[in-house]
Every structure is written in C-alpha cells, then in structure tokens.
C-alpha cells in the first residue's frame, strides 16, 4: 500500500539530517534545535504522497550514497516500448493514457462469447451495470474496506461489472471484485496487521540499493491471500465478462499501465500467479522506499526489464467507462436498459482541513505540498466526473468524513485503522448517502439532473 514504508523513509531522512549536522551545513532551520528539525521532517514526510515524496527520497540518496550495488538490468529501448510481449500472456495490459480506441481494441480482443455474458446476466444480476473505482491512501484504505463490508451487511452492495484499484486500492480491489464472500479477508487485511507486518527497516538500502525498506513482509501477505484457488475465482468471473483492472506506473516511460488481472488469471501459464502477485506489489510500491518491481518483457526475441511502482504516482484513482460503453449498453448483455452506475471510493479526506502553519521552511513546504496533493486527487475526481457526464453514467462518491478525528501514534497504527474501518462500516451499514459530484461541482450536477 502506498505509504506502508513511510516510517522507514522518515528514518532515512533522520539519517540525512544527522549527516548534514556532522558536516556543518544544510540545516532546515538554523535557529531551531536539530531535534526540532527532525520532528519537522517527520511531519513533512508523513503527509507527502508518493509522486512528490520521490524528490525527498532522491535527495537522501544523493547525499548519502557513494555508489549503488543494484543488479544491472536490460533496459527496454524507447523505440520498442509499444512492441513488448509477456511470454505466455496476451492482451493483458494497456497504457492508461492511450486513446480510447486503442484500449478498446485490446480489451475486446478475445472477449467472452455472448452466451457467457448472458449466463452472467441470468445469475440474478441486476440489469444495471455497476462500476467501482478504489483510490490509494495507505492506511486510510481501511475506510474503503470498512465501507465495502458494511455495504454488504446492509444488503445493498451490487456485484460489480468493472473494478479498478490503485495502491492500497489495488489490494482491496480483487476482494471487492469477487464479492461479499471475501469480506472477512478484507476486514482482516485492514485491521489485523500493523507496520511490522508490512515492511522492515532497511536504512542500509540508502547506500547499497534502490530502497529504504524491505517489502518482504508485504509480499508474504499478498502470497497468503492470493493463492491458486483465489486466482481460479478471478478467472471464472473474467470468463463471464467481468473486468478487474489494477494500475501501476512504468518508471522508464512515465506512463500509467492498466493490467487486466482476470486475463492473467485465465492464462494457463504457470507464472500467472507470480505475475498477478507482482502487479499487486508493484501498485503498492512507494518508489525509493520499496524497491521497484521488475517485470520481464520481450521484444524481437530479447528479454528486457521494466520497472513498475505505485500506480498512485500517475493516477490516484482511475476509471474509463467510455472504453466499455458498447458492452455496458449492449442489449444482449442484459444491461441495456438502466443507466450505468459508477461508485468511487476515495480513501482520504477531500474537505479543506484547518491547521496553524509555523513560519519556517519546513512547515510552509509541508502545508503547501500536502495541499497540492489533496487538490491533485480532487482533480482526478473532476476528470472521472466529466467522463461520466459525457457517457451518461451515474456518479457516486464516498470519502473519509471531515469529522473523523482519530490520529495515529505510528504509521499503520492498528488502533487507527480499526477505528477508520469501523467508521466506514458504520456509514455503509446505515444506508450511506453517496455524494453525486466532486467538491465544487454540485451545482453543475443539479443543473444537469
């Protein structure tokens, strides 16, 4: 999950400050004590999102690393970036920023036959198409998990035709895709585990490697929950025409990559489960803190290594319903009558939060960047909302309430996550009132309705 390794990176920043202190320069606030600088750095790093944390992480590496001992990789030439193959897999991914027609061509290739879609519709599935997009948010993903479980217990949660996930949302999405039978696992993942179950400190990685933390605990958690039986369930649902997409970021190309996890699960390749797990880990990989995930591809018979990291670096939440509009409105699919519905779970607060800002460089930078990031996330919501207005899709938004005031004593504090899970659960179990437009767009929504 994005932010899982936050504490490790903060420790690395502390090390940088100690280094600067010994060298006699570079202090953030010469009038304050060094301890205060460290405390300010902790607060600064705690609030930064993956895309902008990268700059601080890079700074720490530049200041402390004389050389790296990372194993060399065979980098894919820029000219071949659009010609890659993954051995044993076909049509399993697309660029998230590609033209809709190109994406649609990939998604429609080898689609299940009409009789499979009709069989799905016959399983008492509502005639309306339901889409779900789950954002990242680190430990705040507990809100989305609780919301989904409470929604199930309210008896109103639909089966989703399309589910997308990024970062912590990527770890929620497969369970949401499979349905309420997996709610127990969702509850477990976001209430049973803490920081030590997610990562271990690896300060030596600043000097010797590509990461500040060891992601082995998180990888083991993914392996625990994503087993062969789990993959078979995903494959069965994909055969019915349902779609699960997970987003990663290709660092070499600076582009979002969307993975069709159902097609990976349907593959007969023995490495399908390995790739499935890798993609979940990559989507949750905060760059510079966790090591990037290498994914081997082939071009012209030669093997190359791509570097994939947190999907939230390029998209905090994503959906592309227009790509699937032909299927959503196809009468043969059993979903041609009612208006499709999109549900967006934003694992974070979208309301302004007041805070007294100290007049020093750290506080000013901290507040400015956290404000920028919050508004970037809202910008993603605007983009999605505009697509739904264009394509005639009902927009529904959930986010952490402004009055949720529980705080964490440490990253991934179980007490905090349990409280947030229960808040999401309580809201959904009492018939949650979904917001019909992003902040500031309510009047536009009312004018069109």
Predicted regions and their residues:
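Patatin-like phospholipase
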Residues: 68-162, 177-449
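Gly/Ala-rich beta-loop-alpha elbow adjacent to hydrolase catalytic centers
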Residues: 165, 169
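Residue-identity detector for glycine
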Residues: 3, 24-26, 55
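Extreme N-terminal basic, low-complexity initiation segments
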Residues: 2-8
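Bacterial N-terminal signal peptides that target proteins for export
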Residues: 34-55
């Amino acid at each position: 999950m994005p932010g899982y390794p936050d504490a490790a990176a903060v420790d690395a920043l502390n090390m940088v400050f100690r280094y600067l202190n010994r060298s006699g320069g570079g202090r953030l606030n010469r009038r304050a004590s060094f301890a205060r600088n460290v405390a300010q750095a902790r607060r600064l790093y705690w609030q930064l999102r993956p895309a902008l944390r990268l700059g601080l992480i890079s700074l720490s590496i530049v200041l402390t690393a004389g050389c790296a001992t990372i194993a060399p990789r065979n980098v894919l030439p820029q000219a071949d970036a659009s010609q890659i193959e993954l051995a044993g897999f076909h049509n399993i991914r697309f660029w998230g920023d590609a033209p809709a027609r190109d994406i649609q061509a990939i998604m429609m290739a080898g689609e299940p036959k009409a009789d499979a879609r009709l069989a799905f519709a016959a399983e008492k599935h509502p005639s309306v198409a339901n889409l779900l997009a789950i954002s990242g948010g680190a430990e705040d993903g507990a809100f989305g998990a609780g919301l989904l479980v409470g929604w199930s217990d309210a008896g109103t949660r639909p089966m989703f035709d399309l589910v997308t996930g990024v970062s912590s949302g990527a770890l929620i999405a497969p369970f949401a895709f499979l349905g309420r039978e997996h709610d127990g696992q969702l509850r477990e993942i976001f209430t049973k585990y803490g920081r030590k179950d997610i990562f271990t400190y690896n300060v030596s990685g600043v000097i010797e490697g590509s990461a500040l933390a060891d992601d082995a605990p998180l990888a083991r958690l993914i392996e625990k929950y994503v087993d062969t039986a789990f993959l078979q369930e995903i494959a069965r649902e994909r055969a019915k025409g349902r779609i699960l997409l997970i987003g990663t970021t290709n660092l070499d190309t600076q582009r979002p990559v969307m993975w069709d996890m159902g097609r990976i699960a349907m593959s007969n390749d023995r490495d399908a489960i390995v790739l499935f797990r890798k993609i979940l880990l990559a989507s949750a990989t905060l760059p510079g803190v966790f090591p990037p995930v290498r994914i081997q591809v082939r071009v012209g018979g030669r093997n190359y290594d791509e570097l994939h990291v947190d999907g939230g670096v390029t998209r905090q939440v994503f959906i592309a319903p227009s790509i699937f509009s032909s299927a959503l409105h196809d009468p043969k699919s059993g979903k041609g009558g009612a208006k499709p519905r999109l549900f967006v779970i934003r694992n974070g607060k979208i309301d302004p939060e007041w805070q007294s800002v100290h007049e020093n460089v750290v506080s000013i930078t901290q507040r400015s960047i956290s404000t920028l990031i919050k508004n970037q996330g809202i910008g993603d919501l605007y983009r999605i909302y505009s697509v739904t207005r264009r394509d005639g899709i009902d927009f529904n938004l959930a986010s952490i309430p402004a009055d949720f005031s529980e705080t964490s004593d440490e990253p991934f504090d179980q007490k905090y996550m349990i409280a947030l899970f229960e808040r999401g659960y309580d809201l959904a179990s009492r018939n949650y009132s979904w917001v019909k437009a992003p902040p500031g767009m309510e009047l536009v929504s009312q004018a069109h309705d």
